[in-house]
Amino acid sequence: MRDPVDYFHNSLVPMVVEQSSRGERAFDIYSRLLRERIIFLTGPVEDQGASLIVAQLLFLEAENPKKEISFYINSPGGVVTSGLSIYDTMQFIRCPVTTLCVGQAASMGSLLLAAGEAGHRFALPNARIMVHQPSGGFQGQATDILIHAREIEALKKRLNEIYVKHTGRDYETIHQALERDNFMTADAAKEFGLIDDILHKRPEPAAA
C-alpha cells in the first residue's frame, strides 16, 4: 500500500513558476519557501524527514548565520532520536529559529515547538499541542528487554530536562504533566510555557 505521506509530497505538491531575465523557473512550493528561510515539519517525525530538516537548517545557516529561520510544525510526533537530531541542530546553529504550530504539535512535535528562540515560539489560535512520555516496544531475551527499558527511562529523563529548560517549569511539574497524553489548547500551551504567544493575524510590515 502506498504511503499517504509520500503520495502527498510526490504527487500533490504545487509548483511555482517565476519569471526572470533568464526565462521561467519552476520550483515546488517547499523549495520556493526555503528561499524565504521557511522550513516545514509536516507529518510524523522519522529519520528521512529529520535528515532533510537538519540539512535545510545547516544550509540556511551557511547562507546567513545571523538571519532568522521560520520553522512551521504540523506533526503528531514520532521517533524520539529523529526528533532529537532536529532539536540538537536547532540549538547548534547560530541562526535564531522561530517556531510556529499550525494544526498540531504532539509528542516530539511539541518539544521542537518549545525549542524555538525564546520569545519567538508561536501557535495559531486553533492549534493543538500534546505532551507525553516516550513509548516503545521490544521483543527478545529478558536481559535485552531490561536494557531497552533502561534506555527508555533514560530518554524520558532527558526529554523532561529539555522541557524544563524551555518552559521554565520545575522537573516535578514536567514529570507529572508528561505521565499521560496531555492535550492543550494554544492558550493552555502558552500558560504552560511551551509557546510565547498566539498569532491571530500576520503583523503588517513596518513602514519603510
UniProtKB/Swiss-Prot annotation:
Catalytic function, reaction form: Hydrolysis of proteins to small peptides in the presence of ATP and magnesium. alpha-casein is the usual test substrate. In the absence of ATP, only oligopeptides shorter than five residues are hydrolyzed (such as succinyl-Leu-Tyr-|-NHMec, and Leu-Tyr-Leu-|-Tyr-Trp, in which cleavage of the -Tyr-|-Leu- and -Tyr-|-Trp bonds also occurs)
CDD domains in the record: S14_ClpP_2
PROSITE patterns linked: CLP_PROTEASE_HIS, CLP_PROTEASE_SER
Pfam families: CLP_protease
Broad class of the protein's primary localization: cytoplasm
GO cellular component: cytoplasm; endopeptidase Clp complex
The EC number(s) this enzyme carries: 3.4.21.92
GO biological process, one term: protein quality control for misfolded or incompletely synthesized proteins
Location of the protein in the cell: Cytoplasm
Enzyme class: hydrolase
Keywords from the UniProt entry: Cytoplasm, Hydrolase, Protease, Serine protease
Keyword match Protease: yes
One term of GO molecular function: ATP-dependent peptidase activity
Active site: 107 (nucleophile), 132
Family: Belongs to the peptidase S14 family.
Record-linked NCBIfam families: PRK00277.1, PRK12553.1
Role description: Cleaves peptides in various proteins in a process that requires ATP hydrolysis. Has a chymotrypsin-like activity. Plays a major role in the degradation of misfolded proteins.
Subunit structure: Fourteen ClpP subunits assemble into 2 heptameric rings which stack back to back to give a disk-like structure with a central cavity, resembling the structure of eukaryotic proteasomes.
Name of this chain's protein: ATP-dependent Clp protease proteolytic subunit
Native species: Methylorubrum populi (strain ATCC BAA-705 / NCIMB 13946 / BJ001)
Gene behind the chain: clpP
